[in-house]
Amino acid sequence: MFPTELFTFPLNMICCVIWIAAVVSLYRNCRSTSFVRFMLSPAATYFSIGLLISICIFIGLTDRRDLTDSWIFTAILFFFQTVLLFVVLRGWKKSPANIVHHKHIRWRFIMMHAGLIIALGSGFWGAPDKQIVRMKAETDKPTNETWYIDGRPSWLPYSITLKAFNILKFSDGSPESFEAKVIIDDKPVSLRVNHPYKKNLVEDIYLSSYDSAAGDDSNYCIIQIVRDPWKYGKVIGIIMLLAGVFLLFINGPEVYRHDD
């Protein structure tokens, strides 16, 4: 497995800056080398996309989600981002055949490609800083002890207490939704499935599970705490990507010519 935990902030940020600087330097100063020419070629684009799609399909078909933490998946995603960054840099040097639409074409290209690299990069470089832990919250028993998926314990700087658990049902008796009423730092909070409580800008608290055998009488529930400082980078990247797609839909495709 790739040692993701070794690259927590600020080391991941430093590595990201060094990577960007290295790619920019190679593009500006070594464009005639075989390596840079390959990275700028359609072959590199097709190869990187093919590798990424192939491993994603393999993970989906085999349910080997542990491979997302492997060296090979990390290397493929890094290679894909590197090719994409070279493409973005080259995009600044391109002009459309119809100069009237120059601004639209450039913004469209930047929004789509830079948006994709920001969204992917936030997930890739921010992975070491993302923390997902779970806790067993019991009725009237404050606790701050949590566990990572591999069983390692950790402790929150605040406590959570379960006060009540309710199951809302349809008229036929089937469950409609689940609700856990908890106390978080002396503040009453209602947790429902897919309706997390936002503790702060980077931390969300989810209702994950409960004692299904006890039903409404469940005296505990499983709570998941997700801390992701890079999530807003993903949101910004996705918004940029969608904006680029919208501009493409509005203005249609254009023909490019190389300026370099």
Where are these regions (language model features)?
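Solvent-exposed, non-transmembrane regions of integral membrane proteins
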Residues: 1-260
